[in-house]
UniProtKB/Swiss-Prot annotation:
Residues 342-354 have a biased composition (Polar residues). Residues 1-22 form the signal peptide. Residues 336-357 are annotated as: Disordered. It is found in: Secreted; Host nucleus. A motif (RxLR-dEER) lies at residues 48-65. One of its GO terms (cellular component) is extracellular region. Keywords: Host nucleus, Secreted, Signal, Virulence. The RxLR-dEER motif acts to carry the protein into the host cell cytoplasm through binding to cell surface phosphatidylinositol-3-phosphate. Secreted effector that acts as an elicitor that induces cell death in host plant cells. This is Secreted RxLR effector protein 35. The keyword RNA-binding does not apply. It comes from Plasmopara viticola. The keyword Ligase does not apply.
Length: 435
């Protein structure tokens, strides 16, 4: 629309100049006390009117005639066909300056238009009664911002630019997520699988290290990437690329920034919808509640839950078997009582002085079914070596002279100690009571 506007204005000025030059009646002007000068060509057209009956000086008529070829030269420069008039007008340096000033003049109106478009968009995507309500919008990225990148930020090697792809961690499950995501989007805002994968990965970031500003910067980078991909398509057409390169650099930067904001608005709308509907699009992890209501890092929370289950074979135990075994081995090795073994029968006898073992009670692990299962992290042989001496400390004292009179079942051997440990709870806390 801008190009058509400037074409119409330029053609009207040329046509009026031609009519004035070909007629006997001169153009009228209200001087307002301004004296004509020889360099009156630089005066703006805002002071000239095509209506009036006053007679003006001949030098003003000459001014109009001298201004006419100047406009004609600008308009007809490079024009071969009228269909290309819009492109030629944009190539004029003066037209480029005017176009650069237009965004500043219409900034207020543009903000109102953006606000109205945002309200209409939100109203359009508002769910119906049977759909869940929109969640917290505190993390939304503003859509009222106009992004302007410098020429240096637009410099890029188009040949090395990579297209949008689905991340490897989302392959195989991106289609149902994309379909659920598209159900909450406008008809003209349907996301692609690549866009869904990128936004999904953004919501998995740790927000303590990557606040909302990081999300905004990443969306700007994705929008810039989309513009450069479009520009690479234009580069494939040689004639179209030549026309693009003939434009003045300020005008090219303006066009790129306009396309950037179009891509950016799309990314922002998609991001806001996805983060609002995250629990409805991908769903929370089963039997797992994330602290502080944060559902943006469900994959990491699920991984942490799985890791904790692997660390402890019994969830109710505060420490795993490996760490308990190390502590017990260190303490019992230092306080192990001295033993004497009879080579004839293999029985173990201890001093008559009882050994204090109340300090070792908290370190004794409970021998349950899970302890004797194959899932135990500590080898069974090492447990026998560590527990054998301490368990034998609970055996009653037997006189070596009476060992021949005692039945063989009453002699506490290494085999009995291992059996005691393997039964896991049949014996009481003290072996002498069980015997």
């Amino acid at each position: 629309m801008r190009g058509a506007y400037y074409i119409i204005i330029a053609l009207c000025v040329v046509a009026s100049s031609q009519v004035a030059a070909g007629s006997d009646r001169q153009l009228q002007i209200y001087e307002h006390g301004v004296m004509p000068a020889d360099n009156a060509v630089v005066k703006t057209l805002a002071k000239r009117f095509l209506r009036g009956s006053r007679v003006v000086h001949d030098d003003l008529a000459n001014e109009e005639r001298s201004f006419h070829p100047f406009l004609v030269d600008m308009i007809e420069e490079g024009i071969k066909e009228m269909s290309h008039a819009a492109e030629i007008v944009e190539e004029m340096p003066l037209a480029g300056k005017v176009v650069e000033e237009v965004p500043h003049a219409t900034e207020g109106g543009q903000q109102k238009m953006d606000k109205g478009a945002e309200e209409a968009f939100e109203k359009h995507v508002e769910p119906s009664g049977h759909t869940a309500t929109i969640q917290d919008t505190s993390r939304d990225i503003s859509t009222q911002e106009v992004i302007q990148l410098s020429p240096h930020e637009w410099e890029s090697d188009l040949s090395k630019l990579k297209p949008f792809v689905v991340l490897n961690k989302h392959r195989g499950r991106i289609e149902p997520v994309k379909d659920a995501f598209a159900a909450f989007c406008d008809e003209g805002l349907k996301p692609t699988t690549e866009e869904t994968s990128i936004i999904w990965s953004m919501l998995g970031w740790n927000l303590a290290r990557k606040p909302k500003g990081k999300h905004r910067q990443h969306l700007i980078a994705q929008a810039r990437r989309g513009v450069l991909l479009d520009l690479r398509i234009v580069r494939m057409d040689e004639s179209l690329w030549n026309k693009w390169m003939q434009l003045p650099k300020p005008l090219r930067m303006l066009k790129l920034n306009n396309l950037l904001n179009m891509h950016y608005q799309r990314w922002v709308h998609l991001f806001n919808i996805f983060q609002r509907r995250l629990s409805e699009i991908i769903g929370p992890p089963p039997k797992l509640k994330v602290a502080h209501g944060d559902t943006t890092d469900t994959s990491k929370a699920l991984a942490l839950h799985t890791h904790s289950n692997m660390q402890s074979s019994t969830p109710s135990e505060p420490l795993n078997a490996a760490s308990t075994f190390k502590v017990e081995r260190f303490v019992w090795g230092a306080n192990r009582p001295k033993r004497t073994t009879d080579g004839n029968t293999g029985t173990i006898s201890l001093p008559t002085k009882p050994t204090k073992t109340h300090r070792l009670k908290p370190l004794m692990p409970r021998l349950t079914e899970s302890t004797t299962s194959s899932d135990l992290l500590v080898p069974t042989k090492r447990m026998r070596l560590s527990f054998g001496g301490t368990r034998s400390a609970f055996a009653p004292y037997k006189d070596p002279k009476e060992k021949l009179l005692a039945p063989s079942s009453t002699a506490l051997t290494h085999k009995d100690i291992d059996l005691d440990l393997s039964l896991g709870g049949i014996y009481g806390k003290r072996t002498d009571k069980a015997l």
